[in-house]
């Protein structure tokens, strides 16, 4: 069982990461070469951990980076929330000890608040801020009804003004994340992406669904390809990148400079290193069930070390334990936990149960 006394996130990764096939020390994006153009850095380091609200906290980002992600994004951060000084909002952009750097995603509708937020985030993070991304893709009604997120795709002039406001304020690159369009059947992504690039966006991430689809149906990678053909800035492909092979296929089939992995990383931080192996012409090693349990334990220790709410571990259990024997039982056990010690007790029991099951199989074959 992992120690519950480790306090530093960097110490947790150094102690537990290598044992589960993860890096014990995290490197900065593109080796920290901030002086190089973003296009070059993305081309050489194309595997990105997507921003996900309620998911990509510091512990999750560190697991993804340890699993091979070249760069990880914050959860989407409200410009208004930063303006009004909510400490909970500011916590979303904080970088934990051992986390080398961060891409911060902002959302809102007011250019002046975007300029202020970008400047404040840049001051707070300093050299650890890689880029500012503007969310123009979130399909959630409580966001779009305010004209934010994917609703901005119906107000391109306003969207362009947000890009210009940020680009005119900070020295780091400003990028955008968009969808195929807001409403089913109304594809605007290629032209919209051109307008954002003209306004100063140095890269465009494209999710191949309409906002009205949410995450239903299939992402259309053809629209990603059309955006690649429409703009002169790097395009980052997103949508239905569920495993390492799909990450490699996105790059090969669409011509994108980089690929953004979201739900495919659930319980699978190795997706990035596996994709890198495929891109290098090598077959990735499979991940054993025991290694997944150990990685869940590592992730829980990172949650504790970064001061995150440990109830997030209940979702993590669903993801890491998916497909295991009696997974529903073990998920139920995890759902009863609220402290690190309780979670680690469950993983210890699970590990013993797996060892006993293996021993029984071996005895049956003797």
Positions of PLM-derived features:
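Glycine-rich, positively charged N-terminal anion/phosphate-binding segment
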Residues: 20-41, 52-127
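Active-site mouth loops of central-metabolism enzymes
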Residues: 45-55, 102-114, 152, 177-189
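Alpha/beta catalytic cores of nucleotide-metabolism and tRNA/nucleoside-modifying enzymes
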Residues: 1-43, 47-48, 53, 59, ...
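Hydrophobic faces of well-ordered beta-strands that scaffold small-molecule active sites
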Residues: 47-51, 72-74, 102-106, 132-134, ...
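N-terminal small/glycine-rich loop or linker at the start of catalytic domains
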Residues: 36-48, 83-101, 138-148, 167-175, ...
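Active-site beta-loop-alpha junctions enriched in small/polar residues
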Residues: 52-54, 77-79, 107-109, 137-139, ...
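Alpha/beta enzyme core
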Residues: 115-148, 155-233
């Amino acid at each position: 069982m992992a120690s519950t006394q480790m306090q530093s996130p960097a110490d947790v990764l150094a102690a537990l990461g290598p044992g589960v096939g993860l890096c014990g020390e995290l490197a900065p994006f593109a080796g920290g070469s901030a002086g190089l153009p973003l296009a070059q850095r993305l081309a050489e380091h194309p595997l990105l951990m997507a921003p996900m609200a309620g998911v990509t906290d510091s512990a999750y980002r560190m697991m993804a980076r340890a699993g091979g992600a070249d760069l990880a994004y914050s959860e989407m951060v409200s410009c208004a929330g930063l303006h009004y000084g909510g400490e909970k909002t500011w916590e979303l952009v904080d970088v934990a000890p051992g986390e080398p750097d961060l891409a911060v995603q902002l959302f809102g509708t007011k250019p002046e608040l975007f300029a202020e937020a970008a400047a404040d985030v840049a001051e707070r993070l300093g050299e650890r801020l890689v880029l500012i991304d503007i969310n123009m893709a979130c399909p959630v009604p409580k966001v779009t009804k305010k004209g934010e997120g994917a609703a901005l795709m119906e107000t391109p002039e306003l969207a362009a003004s947000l890009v210009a406001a940020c680009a005119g304020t900070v020295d780091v690159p400003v990028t955008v994340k968009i969808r195929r369009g807001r409403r089913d059947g109304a594809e605007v992504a290629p032209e919209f992406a051109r307008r954002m690039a003209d306004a100063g966006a140095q890269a465009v991430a494209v999710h191949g669904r309409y906002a009205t689809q949410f995450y239903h149906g299939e992402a259309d990678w053809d629209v990603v390809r059309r955006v690649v053909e429409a703009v002169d800035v790097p395009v980052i492909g997103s949508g239905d990148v569920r495993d390492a092979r799909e990450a490699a296929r996105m790059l090969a089939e669409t011509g994108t400079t980089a690929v953004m992995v979201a739900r495919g990383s659930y319980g699978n931080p190795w997706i990035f290193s596996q994709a890198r192996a495929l891109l290098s012409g090598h077959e990735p090693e499979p991940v054993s069930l025991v290694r997944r349990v150990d990685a869940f334990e590592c992730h829980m220790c990172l949650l504790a070390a970064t001061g995150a709410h440990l109830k997030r571990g209940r979702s993590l259990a669903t993801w890491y334990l998916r497909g295991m024997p009696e997974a529903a039982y073990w998920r139920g056990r995890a759902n009863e936990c609220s402290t690190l010690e309780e979670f680690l007790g469950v993983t210890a029991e699970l590990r013993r149960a797996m060892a006993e099951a293996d021993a029984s199989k071996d005895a049956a074959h003797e």
